[in-house]
Amino acid sequence: MTVTCASSADKIMQAATELFASNNFDATSIKDISKLSGVNSALISYYFGGKKNLYQEVLNNQSVLFLDLIEQVNKQKLSAIMKLHLYTKEVALIQMQRPMQVHLIYRELLTPSGFCTNFVQSRLYKIHQFLFDLVSEGIEEGCIKSSVQPTYVAFTIESIIVFFFLTQNFVRELGSFSKDNENEYLENALNSYLDSIAK
């Protein structure tokens, strides 16, 4: 692919990510994506085969960030509880830098488009399984309380992250947080929970 072609495809992806995140699949048209990207609408079909394929590619790109993070955390020679702390710190950073990720992925669960639900669920399952495995490992290591249920811990961590980003503006106003302090707030919330299950 030439530099020009790559640039056009990237512009389409960037525009589509922004529009799908701020609106949704049905409310976003090829014309909207073409206008925002500055790329001829015919090229959207050329590169991605239409709006549905483009939507799935956008979702895939967003989920890859989290799957790559899981791989990197798993490579670290740390205790399970420290891996959980590292994961929550890094995922908070990713989502503060790229807040559209949460809106895209979780909107598909809340208001399914009908053709990507299984795709998104499979990615979320991998994240859940990763957290479940770490908690189970932590119990075996003796660094996490044996009384906790791994799947409940995984759901709680996921819920803290998702709730914060889906209600971000309300939380910011209620807690009088500035944008600069939001990442610190989320890290502290997650760390407080992890501290409560650690031995």
Q: Where in this protein do the model-derived segments appear?
A:
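N-terminal intrinsically disordered/low-complexity leader segments
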Residues: 1-7
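Amphipathic alpha-helical linker/stalk segments
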Residues: 3, 58-86
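Generic hydrophobic, amphipathic alpha-helix propensity
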Residues: 8-17, 33, 58-66, 131
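Helix-turn-helix
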Residues: 11, 19-53, 57
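Amphipathic, non-transmembrane alpha-helical scaffold segments
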Residues: 55, 59, 63, 117-128, ...
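All-alpha amphipathic helical-bundle segments outside canonical DNA-binding/catalytic cores
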Residues: 82, 118-123, 140-156
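C-terminal peripheral helix-coil segments that are non-catalytic and often amphipathic
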Residues: 86, 90-93, 97, 125-141, ...
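Amphipathic alpha-helical segments used for helix-helix packing
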Residues: 96-118, 167-173
